[in-house]
Design a protein with these regions (language model features):
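Catalytic cores of nucleic-acid ligases and guanylyltransferases
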Residues: 2-177
Length: 178
């Protein structure tokens, strides 16, 4: 999510502009983020309106590809924002800022609103058992995994390695004949 004063833009991981497809996110940003200039790294998650359970990514991919009847899709596939990092704030790049300070900055500007926007849950621990319990609870809540980050780590644009590690369950192998 990019914001520069009144201009708000939403981009996919591949830098596709999807602002038009997510008018609800634009409203969440205006209402719940207390800053007029930022770039936030986040995930958009679809959820079932009745059960409030997270949907798989394929559910929101319908909205990403949608060019028409957007308001209908907003109702059909409600979403929420889960913010996990901030790269730019009030005219200043935070790329060289340690993750712990970036996270504090992120927490300071977001007003969590259930089923609209939230900062990803986190813990700081050196205890393996505590980390394991956090991971298992994340999976039970419908998350696909957790990110493990170095509190002193800087942000590396476009990189999936360095100071972060994504932990997901290992899929069982399949024996298939095609």
């Amino acid at each position: 999510i990019h914001r520069n004063r009144s201009k708000i833009k939403l981009f996919t991981r591949n830098l596709e502009d999807v602002t038009r497809q997510f008018p609800d996110i634009v409203e969440f940003v205006k209402r719940d983020i207390n800053s007029k200039s930022f770039i936030i790294d986040c995930e958009v998650i679809g959820y079932d309106q009745k059960t409030k359970i997270w949907k798989p990514f394929q559910a929101i991919s319908q909205r990403i590809k949608r060019k028409y009847n957007i308001e209908e899709m907003v109702k059909k596939v409600p979403i929420m924002i889960l913010a996990f990092d901030i790269l730019f704030l009030n005219g200043k790049s935070l790329l060289e800022t340690p993750f712990e300070k970036r996270r504090n900055s992120l927490n300071s500007i977001i007003k969590s609103e259930r089923f609209a926007i939230d900062v990803a849950k986190s813990i700081v621990t050196e205890n393996v058992k505590t980390a394991q319990i956090f991971y298992e609870r994340a999976l039970l809540s419908g998350a696909e995994g957790v990110m493990v980050k170095n509190l002193k780590g800087i942000y590396k644009p476009g990189s999936r390695v360095g100071f972060g590690l994504k932990m997901k369950p290992v899929m069982e192998s399949l024996d298939l004949t095609i």
